[in-house]
């Protein structure tokens, strides 16, 4: 619940963790920084926004996941882009993701469609690896004491 928001209930929408920060900024009256990736959920929570996103695409190491209210689909590729494996969960029957049905013949068209969705919706730099930042040494650590 957000202070000043009288609307109660839940919205069956896809939200992402990156949406939390801009939402908190807007809720307390701070400007949302321009580099923020997410979208504020304030209009969604107050019922003003009916055009909220219908899916999310997530990258984790070599895996790319598409999910919406109906499906969760993950595909893994090697560094050269070659297919390594995949999994599909049908949320209407398996919301806990216990049965991978990606290779079931009856889901072939669903898998093909979700693969197209991933390609169509991801950004051009989506598959680039983010370089690891050098961590500054903190005073008081063992590394600091060894110098």
Feature map (PLM): residue ranges:
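Active-site-proximal N-terminal segment of extracellular/periplasmic enzymes that hydrolyze or transfer
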Residues: 101-107
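C-terminal cap/loop subdomain of S1 sulfatases and analogous C-terminal strand-loop tails that border
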Residues: 6, 13, 18-92, 96, ...
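Short amphipathic alpha-helical coupling segments at ligand-binding clamshell hinges
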Residues: 110-114
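Active-site oxyanion-binding pockets that recognize sulfate/phosphate
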Residues: 7-10, 104
């Amino acid at each position: 619940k957000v202070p000043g928001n009288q609307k109660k209930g839940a919205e069956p929408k896809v939200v992402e963790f990156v949406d939390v920060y801009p939402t908190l900024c807007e809720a307390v009256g701070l400007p949302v920084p321009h580099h923020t990736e997410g979208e504020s959920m304030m209009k969604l929570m107050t019922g003003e926004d009916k055009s909220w996103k219908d899916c999310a695409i997530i990258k984790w190491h070599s895996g790319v996941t598409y999910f919406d209210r109906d499906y969760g689909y993950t595909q893994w590729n090697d560094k050269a882009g070659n297919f390594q494996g995949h999994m599909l969960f049908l949320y209407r029957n398996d919301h806990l993701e216990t049965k991978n049905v990606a290779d079931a013949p009856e889901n072939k068209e669903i898998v093909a469609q979700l693969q197209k969705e991933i390609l169509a919706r991801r950004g051009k730099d989506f598959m680039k690896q983010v370089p690891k930042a050098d961590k500054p040494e903190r005073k008081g650590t063992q590394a600091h004491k060894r110098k």
